[in-house]
């Protein structure tokens, strides 16, 4: 769930907010510096179509964000659900390593909808997007995110990446459309600007386009409308890749195409249980055990898999490479934060993860031609965030403990 786009909220969600603006398929975890990702923002709605989320506690511009019932909010490893009270829609979500799934339960309505903000990005905006309607149930495309669109460090973090998607709906696309906002070239499109009233007004006035099957633009949105009966459910599955559209489609086919929401949720629970069972504890209260395993869960979110199911990944030279069986390319290494806490723990409970990350940093230094380890890596960016060279401590610790599945001489 996402509650905010601008400001300084790296995860895109804050418990203090009273409204939700959508559900994204990429997300950062527990960071500052204005955040990033939060791409492919999906929102189920009913009634009038709004093209912007609007602003919480600001009625000067209307949007599709919705209040939600805190009492219905459930969050577990691999599962989240909530009731959107403005639309009386229950939303449930789960995921596989490369894909996500949303399960919506609608009220009775002649104008139910799923809408997607393709430009959305935590801390800024995607600067260009592409979408194509593939068939009666499927869309695919990409979202290009550059420093000009803010994001990590409001652009100073130099995050430059493209998210590719392949999405299928359980209801046919019989009544769909796009919107495309004409953003002037001289407009700044960063953290504060993209949530300003002039910018939101510009997007809200974008015309609806219904006579096309594919579109490229600076600020695109997509929607599909359909009638629903009380309690009717609609599912949406999405494959994500940072390599190319073929990678997103292949990730989709390999991981989620043949599965329903219940299967994905069950497999996600089993996968997290397997990981969390790396450490077993005794004694303590139930609350203390919950705190322990919640903290442990957070240590396992990053560095995350950056390699497609076929082994391909975008390297430090921004070209496509293929990893061999010795490592899985990973991303999001917040060195300053983790070199003396998370990574010493991982050397004990998950040495393969440490090996993957060291190989990822080594290949990135080699492919980029920089020949040094980045201290805060995000999607191949040498962001320069924080101080020192914490990766050296991670490397030394791993080497001493016998984790040497990398080119030590290099």
Where are these regions (language model features)?
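Accessory carbohydrate-recognition regions in carbohydrate-active enzymes
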Residues: 1-410
């Amino acid at each position: 769930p996402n509650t905010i786009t601008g400001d300084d909220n790296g995860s895109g969600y804050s418990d203090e907010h009273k409204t939700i603006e959508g559900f994204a398929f990429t997300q950062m975890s527990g960071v500052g510096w204005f955040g990033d990702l939060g791409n492919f923002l999906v929102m189920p709605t009913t009634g009038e179509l709004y093209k912007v989320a609007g602003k919480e506690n600001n009625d000067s511009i209307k949007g599709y964000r919705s209040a939600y019932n805190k009492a219905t909010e459930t969050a577990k490893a691999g599962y989240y659900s909530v009731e959107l009270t403005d639309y009386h829609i229950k939303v449930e979500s789960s995921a596989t390593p490369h894909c996500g799934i949303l399960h919506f339960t609608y009220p009775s309505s002649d104008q139910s909808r799923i809408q997607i903000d393709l430009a959305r990005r935590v801390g800024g905006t995607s600067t260009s997007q592409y979408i194509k309607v593939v068939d009666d149930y499927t869309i695919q495309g990409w979202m290009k995110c550059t420093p000009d669109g803010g994001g990590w460090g409001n652009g100073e973090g130099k995050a430059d990446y493209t998210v590719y998607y392949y999405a299928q709906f359980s209801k046919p696309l019989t009544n769909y459309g796009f919107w495309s906002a004409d953003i002037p070239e001289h407009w700044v499109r960063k953290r504060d600007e993209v949530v300003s009233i002039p910018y939101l007004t510009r997007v809200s006035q974008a015309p609806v386009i219904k006579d096309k099957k594919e579109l490229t633009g600076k600020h695109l949105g997509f929607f599909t409308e359909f009638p629903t009966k009380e309690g009717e459910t609609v599912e949406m599955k999405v494959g994500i890749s940072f390599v190319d559209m073929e990678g997103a489609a292949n990730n989709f086919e390999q991981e989620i195409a043949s599965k329903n929401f219940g299967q994905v949720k069950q497999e996600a629970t089993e996968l997290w249980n397997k990981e969390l069972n790396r450490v077993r504890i005794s004694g303590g209260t139930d609350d203390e055990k919950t705190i322990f395993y919640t903290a442990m869960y957070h240590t396992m979110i990053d560095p995350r898999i950056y390699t497609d199911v076929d082994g391909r990944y975008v390297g430090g030279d921004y070209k496509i490479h293929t990893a061999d069986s010795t490592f899985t390319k990973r991303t999001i290494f917040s060195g300053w934060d983790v070199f003396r806490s998370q990574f010493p723990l991982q050397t004990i409970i998950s040495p393969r993860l440490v090996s993957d990350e060291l190989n990822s940093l080594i290949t990135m230094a080699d492919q980029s031609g920089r020949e040094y380890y980045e201290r805060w890596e995000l999607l191949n960016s040498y962001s320069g965030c924080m101080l020192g060279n914490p990766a050296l401590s991670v490397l030394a610790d791993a080497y001493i403990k016998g984790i040497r599945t990398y080119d030590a001489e290099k």
